[in-house]
Amino acid sequence: NHAWYGIVSNLKTQLTENLNLNLGLDLRTYKGDHYRQISNMLGLNGWYETRRLFNQDHANNIPGTTVVANNTVTQYMPAEPWKTFFNSIDDNQKIDYDYSETISYGGVFGQLEYQKNNVTAFFQGAVSNQSHQRFDYYDYESKYSDSEKVNNIGFNVKGGGSYTFSEKHT
């Protein structure tokens, strides 16, 4: 299951006869749930699995400290394309992986443009941040299931201009 929400907005205004301002905003957020489930038991009554859970150091093989999880799966959802959008299975009936992810993005930009006679010039800048975090319900001990939230900040600044020598050349 995935859910995207967001807004993109733009404002363009003429400040003077020769000066235009363009401002924008882009906000988005995403929440996704990712897991695997059985679609056909192929005649079996159930599926049993044992797995070693990861700790805060992402290790699952330390003697004496490794936590083991056991899981018995008895439910399945037939692989019918349109039903997969709406089906829901109990957490203890998931196999292989089960995690959620949240991604958020925010950005603003602005551009100032000057134009008079044969001269045009502009200055543009933008800043954005994308953050993401994973919540692993399957492979980690519950107290370590939330990953660190990571932020990726970006920006740009540009400027430029042109002079028109004639109608055919700039």
Predicted regions and their residues:
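Signature of Gram-negative outer-membrane beta-barrel scaffolds
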Residues: L21-T170
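Short alpha-helical segments and helix-capping/turn motifs at coil-helix boundaries
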Residues: W4-N10
